[in-house]
Amino acid sequence: MEILLIVLGAVVAGLLCPVQTAAEATITLTGSDIPTSISIHHGTRTPTSSGELSQSTFSSSSTNSSDSFYTTTSASYTLLVGSHTTSTVTANETTLSGNATATETSREPQPTNTRPCNGYAEFCARSYGNITQVAAHNSPFVRPGNIASNQELDVVTQLNDGIRMLQFQTHLVNGTIYLCHSSCDLLNAGTLESYLKKVADWLRDNPYDVVSLLIGNGDFVGVKNFTAPIQSSGLIDHVYTPKNHSIALDDWPTLSEVILSGKRAMVFMDYEANHGEVPYILDEFTYIWETPFSPTDRNFPCDIQRPPGLNEADARKRMYMANHNLNLEISIAGATILVPNTVLLNETNAVSGFGSMGAMAGNCTEKWNRPPNFLLVDYYNIGNVNGSVFQVAAKLNNVTYNGKCCGRTTSLASESVLGRLSGKLEMIYSMIVINILVMTIL
C-alpha cells in the first residue's frame, strides 16, 4: 500500500537534509500550506508513530526491499493516504455499490489518516478515476427568476458545499469569452476570466482539494481563445497537464499525487480541444462519456449518448458522467425549448424513489459495474433531505457524508408566494427574450 506523509507547518529551505539513496527522489512542490519538497522511498516498513517520521514525504509500495529509510523526528505530520475497503451500501432501499478497491491487509499497524483529500481521508490513495463527484450543471447561471438559471448558490458556496466539478457554457462575444446560457441576451453571467478567478482563489485557500472544470464550447471556437482567461485569472498556476493525451480509466493519478503536484484543476472541454495546441485543456470525450444530455425522461437511462458511436468496450475504459438534470419541454411561438424542471427538484435530487439520483446511480452502477464518476445536477442544494446529492455520492464512494450544506427540502415551485414574486419581473423579461429569439430563428 502506498503511504504518503505530509508535514504540517512551515518548512524552511535548508533545514531538512535527509540522506538520499538511489531508491529516493526529490519532488518540488508549490503552495503555501504544503512542504517545499518530498522524498519518495520504496520499502516494506511503515512508520507507526510520529517519532519515526521525518519532515519529508515517503511512499512505501515495494514488497521486495528488505529495509526502509526514515529519519527520526517528533515534528507534527499529516498522513495523506486513504484506506481501501469494499462494501455494498443501501440508500433507502436503493442499493449502491461503491468505488473503493480492496487491498491486502498489512502485517503491521498503519497510521491513521488525518488529512482529507476532497473532503474525505479515504480519497487520498484512490485514483482520480475511481471517485464519484457531484457536478454543478451550468454552475455560473445563478439568476433568481430567470428561466435559464440552473443554480441558486454562487460558485464559492458550491465549492464550499462539496461540488467538485463545475460545468458551464461559453460564448465568444467581440473577442471575449462570456458565460451565457444559449444566448447572452437570455442569461449573461459575466466573463469566463472573472469566474475562473474565483475558482483560482478558492483553490489557493484549499490546498488539499482537486476541482474539475468542464467547459461547454457553445460557439465551437478554437481552443486558444480560452488560454487568456485561464492565464489572466490565475487558474493557470493550478491546471493539470497529463503526460500524454489519452489516459485510461485505471491510469489516473491518485488524489494525493495530484495534490502534491500542486496542479489541482482538471480542465476539460467538450468540443475543439486540441492537445497539441493547448495540452492542459483536455478533450472531454477522450476521457469521459455521457448519458443522454438535457434529459426529460425521469427514468434517466444510463446509455451512451456522447460521444456518438462509442462502443461499450471503449466506454468501459473511460470515466463517465450521468446527466441528472431533469428538463421540461415548453412551447413558445410554435418552437419547443428545454428549461430546468424545478417543480420536481426535491424528487430528482433525492436519495431514493422514482426519478431520484439514488435510483439512477443504482441503475448505472448495475449496468456498468461501477458508479458514475460525475453526477451532473441542477440546484444541487435542493433535495428530499439535507445534502441529498452529496449523500448519494458518498454512498457510491463507500464513505459517510457528514456535511452540513445547503439542503432545502422543498422544490422551488413550493416556495412562498413572496419568494416567487421577487423574481417575477426577470421571469417575464426572460420569456420576452425567448420569444424574440424564437421569432428570429423562424
UniProtKB/Swiss-Prot annotation:
Record's signal peptide: 1-23
InterPro entries: PI-PLC_domain, PLC-like_Pdiesterase_TIM-brl
Glycosylated residues in this chain: N64, N92, N99, N130, N174, N225, N244, N346, N363, N386, N398
Low complexity composition-biased segments: 48-67
A GO molecular-function descriptor: phosphoric diester hydrolase activity
Keyword Transport tagged: no
Organism domain of life: Eukaryota
SUPFAM superfamilies, sorted: PLC-like phosphodiesterases
GO cellular component assignments: extracellular region
CDD domains the UniProt entry points to: PI-PLCc_At5g67130_like
Record-level GO BP terms: lipid metabolic process
Subcellular location: Secreted
Annotated PANTHER family: PLC-LIKE PHOSPHODIESTERASE, PTHR13593
Name by which UniProt lists this protein: Uncharacterized secreted protein ARB_08043
Species name: Arthroderma benhamiae (strain ATCC MYA-4681 / CBS 112371)
Biological classification of the source: Eukaryota, Fungi, Dikarya, Ascomycota, Pezizomycotina
